[in-house]
Each structure stands twice: as structure tokens, then as C-alpha cells.
Design a protein with these regions (language model features):
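Short, low-complexity N-terminal intrinsically disordered segments enriched in polar/charged residues
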Residues: 1-18, 135-136
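A solvent-exposed, acidic/Ser-Thr-rich amphipathic alpha-helical stretch
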Residues: 20-72
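Short, solvent-exposed coil/turn segments at beta-strand boundaries
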Residues: 25-26, 76-77, 105-113
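Structural recognition of the beta-strand scaffold that forms the well-ordered cores
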Residues: 32-33, 103, 114-116
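Conserved N-terminal glycine/acidic-rich loop preference
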Residues: 73-87
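Exposed beta-sheet edge and beta->alpha loop/turn motif
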Residues: 83-111
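Low-complexity, intrinsically disordered terminal/linker segments enriched in charged
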Residues: 114-136
Length: 136
């Protein structure tokens, strides 16, 4: 779907893959991020997490099979939804990971106020544990 907000989500995902986190124009400062059952508050905390994917956890990050659409509800709420396959190679383990993901983005006044992410945390937990163990 090629509406402006869906295109913005595609751009944000491309920037994530490219390790480009100069995206503050797209998020509120106090964006709430929910990753499965974990809640993170604030733009800076969200970007630090994304940046750690590139700096600490993974090499060769790619996103495939991306589909995005945006829903405009009669209540006035606007949500963009993205489905994709994320792939990366663990920096510490060397293991190649493939992970299906689904992200929901709530727009308020032209910016993302809520990001909800649903995916298996297996790769992240395994790489984080391996990285932590390698630092001791």
C-alpha cells in the first residue's frame, strides 16, 4: 500500500537495516515501545535498542518480505501495521537467525507515539547472553 504513512514505515525499516538512526522527525520524544511483554519509554531508549542490534548483537541485518498498510479508524486513530522477515548473523555466536516479525505503529499528530513489536526473542536472548559471557 502506498499511502504516505505506510511509505514512512518502509523508510524507517530501510533506515534500520542501513544502521541510520537519524529518524527523530518520525517519533514523539516520549514514544512508548512494547516489545512482546517489555515496555520501553522514550525515543532515545528505543534508538539505543535498535543501535545495539548493529553495534553489539548482529552483522548482515536484512529485512525481507516486507508488507505495510495503514488503517484509518472512524475514531480518528491511525495505525500502520508491518509484517516482515528479519535476518541477521550473531556477532558473538556466528549463528544465522531468521525471525518473522509484526510491528504496529500508532500515529498521533504525524508522529509515531506507540510502537508495538511482536517477534520471537530467541535470537536476541541468545546473542545477548553470548555477548555478556564473552565480556567476563
Amino acid at each position: 500500500v502506498d499511502d504516505e504513512l505506510s511509505s514512512n514505515i518502509k523508510l524507517l525499516i530501510e533506515k534500520y537495516v542501513d544502521n541510520d538512526f537519524d529518524v527523530s522527525d518520525y517519533y514523539t520524544d516520549d514514544v512508548i515501545t512494547r516489545i512482546n511483554n517489555l515496555e520501553i519509554s522514550g525515543y532515545e531508549n528505543l534508538m539505543q535498542g535498535f543501535q545495539a542490534h548493529h553495534d553489539v548483537l548482529y552483522d548482515n541485518i536484512i529485512v525481507e518480505d516486507l508488507y505495510v498498510h495503514t488503517n484509518y479508524f472512524t475514531s480518528g486513530e491511525i495505525w500502520s501495521n508491518a509484517w516482515f522477515t528479519w535476518k541477521g548473523t550473531g556477532k558473538t555466536t556466528g549463528e544465522e537467525y531468521t525471525n518473522r516479525g509484526h510491528f504496529d505503529y500508532k500515529w498521533e499528530d504525524g508522529k509515531i507515539a506507540i510502537l508495538q513489536a511482536y517477534y520471537s526473542e530467541y535470537a536476541e536472548n541468545k546473542e545477548a547472553a553470548a555477548y555478556t559471557a564473552s565480556q567476563n
